[in-house]
Amino acid sequence: IADKNGLFGAIKFYKAAKSAGIKPILGINASIESSSLTDENNKPLIYNLTLLAKNQNGYKKLIELNTRAYVENRGEGSDNSANMKEEWLSELIDSDESNIVILSGGQTGLIGQLIAKGDIDMAYDAAAEMGDAFGDDFYIELERNGSDFETEYMEHAVAMCSKFNLQPVAVHQNFFINKEDFLAHETRYCVSSKEILYDINRPKRFNKEMY
């Protein structure tokens, strides 16, 4: 389980998995604040990485990073997100023992966002740099979720794995349990984001396959 910017369901999931004889994997789908890139509003670019604990020390490090995000870098007002700063990840590199696995974030990760913007060379550079920094603990996410962007993303993601000898991992983000729950999820999201459900110009972040 990898909750968005938190470990909210970790303990309940851990207990349920252990009772069923399944090894639980705990992590965070983290929002990372870039130290060098900006978005269309000239604010620090925010991208996703999935951080998974390899062991108890890794779990403790996730707690530390997540707490730091909420204490030191939480947004104000309607923007109450708690983003990890990119430079904090250097602590994972400098550690004597690697305790965390890092997944690239898929289409919403740094690599995915750069591909979407057409900054292909920068995307490949980012993949190479992250591979060099995190070694065998870094994986490129491969995902097919029905988005208009998935074909282009998959082509480059597979090519990166081959070019830089990076490890691929198949993922599927799920935001609701059953396919028929899509409309309820969209409604809930629009309430939280103060958007109008039937606004044709509203950004479509989810689709019916994300279950």
Language-model regions: role of each:
Residues I1-Y211:
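Phosphodiester-processing cores and adjacent nucleic acid-binding clamps
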